[in-house]
Amino acid sequence: EITGVTDGAGRHFRLVLTTQAQRAEEARQQAISGGTEPSAFPDTLPGYTEYGRDNGIRLSAVWLTHDPEYPENLPAAPLVRYGWTPRGELAAVYDRSNTQVRSFTYDDKYRGRMVAHRHTGRPEIRYRYDSDGRVTEQLNPAGLSYTYQYEKDRITITDSLDRREVLHTQGEAGLKRVVKKEHADGSVTQSQFDAVGRLRAQTDAAGRTTEYSPDV
C-alpha cells in the first residue's frame, strides 16, 4: 500500500490508511463516548464486488509532514480527512479546519452506486439509473440537468436547455473509450487509443492533432 507521497516541491505527505475493522471500532467508540447506541458497522467487507477485489482498506487522512519552505510551520491537523459508510463507501470529505465540504449518498440496494452528492453550501445533485446500472439523469435544482440515452457504441447527452452532445465509443468493458465527440455547437473532436486504452492522439474541431507518447 502507498503510505507516503513527495511532490515536485519536495513536500512530504503521509497517507493514513484504515481497515474496515479499525473504522468499525472507531464508530463504536464514538457512539459510546456520545452516549448513543452503536450503529451496525461490520468488521469486514465482502472480499469481491462487481467493481473488483476489495481488501477494505481506505484512505482516511492526508498529513503534510515536511515542507522545505516552512519546515517549522507544519499544520497540526490533516490537510484533508475522509469519512466512510459501514459498507465502505465514501461518505464525506473534511478540510483542514475539520469542516465538511463534500457529502455523498448511495443506493440502499446497490453498494457503491452514488445517488446524490453535495458541495457544502450548494444544492444537492441527484442521479437516476436504469436497470443496467447506467446513469439516465443528473438532476441539479439550481443549474443544468442532464439526461443520458444509451445505444450501441453511442451515448446521447441532452441538457435542460435542449442542447445535445453525442459520444461515440469503441472497445469493451474496461477498455471502452470515447473515440468521437459531437459537441452541441456542431463541432467534432476525435481521439485514438492504443491496445491497452492509453490516449495516442486527439484531433480538435479545427483539425489540429496532438499526439501522446506514454513514458513506459
Label each residue range with its predicted role:
Residues 1-216:
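Extended charged/polar low-complexity repeat regions
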